[in-house]
């Protein structure tokens, strides 16, 4: 059995500390995606970038990343990474992970469906928890000369998103790069 990395009580406590609002377990929607064949490092950075956005803002952002119109800021895995001209100030390391954005879009659409099924207002639903963890390792071997073989393993990634319906005055109205950079710092 697979367990969530965050419990409902922890989500309620997180919302209480961040937004100073008391919510119930009925205002929480969750979605998971298992074993996507994507980069684990890029998935962590993408999860960090979409946290504290609404579901619609996160979907629009992932669509822009897929179309190579908006980059994902890279915070942790910056060694030997290119520095680009980016639409924000003071953070030059960025990437355009298309496969990761496509995988996150699948989970975001599932989260939107789960939230509407639970009766939550999609416009007021904010992602409060986004995580990417390593999944199963797919073992492959590349045949070499003289009967040898080289391991050619492939890692997979599990994606987990939790969203909460907040009061309308606490919901971010529009997408801003400053909020994305503040969330990843």
Swiss-Prot record:
Alphabetically, the GO molecular function entries are: rRNA binding; structural constituent of ribosome
Keywords attached to this Swiss-Prot or TrEMBL record, sorted alphabetically, are: Ribonucleoprotein, Ribosomal protein, RNA-binding, rRNA-binding
Per the record's keyword annotation, is Nucleotide-binding included, yes or no? Answer: no
Q: Can the keyword S-adenosyl-L-methionine be found in this entry's annotation?
A: no
SUPFAM superfamilies, A to Z: Ribosomal protein L22
Q: Which residues form a coiled coil?
A: none
Gene Ontology terms: biological process: cytoplasmic translation
Gene Ontology cellular component list: cytosolic large ribosomal subunit
Q: Specify the superkingdom.
A: Archaea
Q: Name one Pfam family in it.
A: Ribosomal_L22
Q: Which InterPro entries does the entry mention?
A: Ribosomal_uL22, Ribosomal_uL22_euk/arc, Ribosomal_uL22_sf
Q: Which NCBIfam families match?
A: PRK04223.1 (NF003260), uL22_arch_euk (TIGR01038)
Report the sequence similarity comment from the record.
Belongs to the universal ribosomal protein uL22 family.
Summarizing the function annotation, the protein's role is: This protein binds specifically to 23S rRNA. It makes multiple contacts with different domains of the 23S rRNA in the assembled 50S subunit and ribosome. The globular domain of the protein is located near the polypeptide exit tunnel on the outside of the subunit, while an extended beta-hairpin is found that lines the wall of the exit tunnel in the center of the 70S ribosome.
Self-association state and partner proteins as the record states: Part of the 50S ribosomal subunit.
Protein name according to UniProt:
Large ribosomal subunit protein uL22
Q: Which gene encodes it?
A: rpl22
């Amino acid at each position: 059995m697979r367990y969530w990395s965050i419990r409902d009580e922890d989500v309620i406590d997180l919302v209480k500390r961040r937004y100073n609002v008391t919510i119930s377990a009925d205002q929480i929607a969750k979605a998971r995606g298992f074993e996507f064949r994507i980069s684990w490092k890029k998935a962590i950075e993408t999860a960090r970038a979409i946290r504290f956005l609404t579901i619609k803002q996160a979907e629009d952002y992932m669509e822009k990343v897929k179309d190579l119109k908006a980059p994902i800021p890279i915070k942790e895995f910056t060694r030997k990474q290119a520095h680009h001209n980016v639409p924000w100030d003071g953070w030059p390391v960025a990437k355009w992970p298309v496969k990761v954005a496509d995988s996150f879009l699948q989970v975001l659409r599932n989260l939107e469906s789960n939230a509407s099924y639970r009766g939550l207002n999609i416009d007021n639903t904010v992602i409060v928890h986004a995580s990417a963890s390593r999944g199963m390792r797919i073992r492959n071997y590349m045949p070499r000369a003289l009967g040898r073989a080289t391991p050619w393993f492939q890692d997979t990634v599990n994606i987990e998103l939790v969203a909460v319906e907040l009061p309308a005055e606490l919901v971010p109205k529009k997408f801003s790069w400053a909020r994305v950079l503040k969330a990843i710092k």
